[in-house]
Swiss-Prot record:
Annotated catalysed reactions: N-acetyl-L-glutamate 5-semialdehyde + phosphate + NADP(+) = N-acetyl-L-glutamyl 5-phosphate + NADPH + H(+)
Protein name as annotated: N-acetyl-gamma-glutamyl-phosphate reductase
InterPro entries: AGPR_AS, AGPR_type-1, NAD(P)-bd_dom_sf, NAGSA_dehydrogenase, Semialdehyde_DH_NAD-bd
Keywords per UniProt: Amino-acid biosynthesis, Arginine biosynthesis, Cytoplasm, NADP, Oxidoreductase
Organism: Neisseria gonorrhoeae (strain ATCC 700825 / FA 1090)
GO MF annotation, one: NADP+ binding
Length: 347
């Protein structure tokens, strides 16, 4: 592009915010023009995040002072409840918005209010938002003014299911079980006893067993692709003693005669961030660390009619900031891979 895209980031002091800063710094077509934080206003970005020394000369500003309305696109890396209040003004001024919180993901307002425990401040915008699971909604994202970036668990679980659901390959009335594990960074950067090293290190536990906020988001995607499946969906998240990474093990029943590996390969043939592994392989979280990738394998369980899907992503990249940049690329007609060609870190 001859003119760089001017981007703003609202709420850039969390892990998702710094990941956006890292990825956008390497993007050839983007200039980060505004970075906001109410609590850190006046602090240099490079002082707050030493990993960005020599990369950014910006300082955090309050949202009112940052000139966000002068940006071409604004990313909200904020807690739930912020974007729905602040995004409408930017949209009215012609700024495109990608919201990495959950404010615009769930179309049924009462359902959203039940799970997030607050009244929605912009219910009229929810129907206008495009759900930004890039590999599912490319065409809609390309035309969007407002993108609801998916959650990390919904991304990891939905990507291996989308091709199968689109062809109605799952058996209705049968259980669909997602057993998921996340690194501690998925809980965010705020102080939390459960995220302390002495609590999360050398430990493994389930949480949200009575119901997790990502459950209705995943069910919404499933229900939109194949009837009779969402009702049998069960989702249990676990906290693993690692910083980054997400692993989903999904148990499902397929219609007779299905060849799921071929279905997945055909659907994702032209998707640069999707990797369908050879038969017998098992994806590892470290194989996607720091990269905007989803690696998937599928096999039939021994002596059973149950199929087992394994899916891994980096929860901060493909599960958050990387997918947001991918959506931005689609919105502005760029190659999806621009700024997202980093090779996973190993070890």
């Amino acid at each position: 592009m001859s003119k760089k895209i001017k981007a703003g980031i609202v709420g850039a002091t969390g892990y998702t915010g710094v990941e956006l800063l890292r990825l956008l710094a390497a993007h050839p077509d983007v200039e980060v023009a505004a970075v906001t934080s109410r609590s850190e206003a006046g602090t240099a970005v490079a002082d707050y995040f030493p990993s960005l020394r020599g990369v950014y000369g910006l300082a955090f500003q309050t949202p009112d002072e940052a000139g966000l309305e002068q940006c071409d696109i604004v990313f909200f890396a904020t807690p739930n409840g912020i974007a729905m209040k602040d995004a409408p003004r930017l949209l009215e001024q012609g700024v495109r918005v990608i919201d990495l919180s959950a404010d615009f993901r769930i179309r049924d307002i009462p359902t959203w209010e039940h799970w997030y425990g607050m009244t929605h401040a912009a219910p009229g915008l929810v129907s206008q938002a495009v759900y930004g699971l890039s590999e599912l909604n490319r065409e809609a994202v390309a035309q969007a003014r407002l993108v609801a970036n998916p959650g990390c668990y919904p991304t990891c679980v939905s990507l291996p299911l989308v091709p199968l659901l689109r062809q109605c390959r799952l058996k209705p009335g049968m259980p669909l079980i997602a057993d998921c594990k996340s690194g501690v960074s998925g809980a965010g950067r705020k102080g939390n006893v459960g995220s302390l090293l002495c609590e999360a290190g050398d430990n493994f536990k389930a949480y949200g067993t009575a119901g997790h906020r990502h459950l209705p988001e995943i069910r919404q995607t499933i229900a939109g692709l194949q009837d009779g499946i969402a009702e049998g969906f069960v989702f249990t998240p676990h906290l693993a003693p690692m910083i980054r990474g997400m692993h989903a093990t999904v148990y499902l029943h397929l219609s007779d005669g299905s060849d799921p590996e071929t279905v997945l390969r055909d659907y994702y043939r032209d998707s640069p961030f999707m990797d369908i592994l050879p038969a017998g392989s098992t994806p590892e979280t470290r194989s996607v660390r720091g990269a905007n990738l989803c690696r998937i394998s599928i096999r039939q369980a021994a002596q059973s009619d149950v199929w087992v899907v394994l899916s891994v992503i980096d929860n901060l990249v493909k599960g958050a900031a990387g997918q947001a940049v991918q959506n931005m690329n689609i919105m502005f007609g760029l190659e999806e891979t621009h700024g997202l060609d980093a090779i996973p870190l190993l070890p």
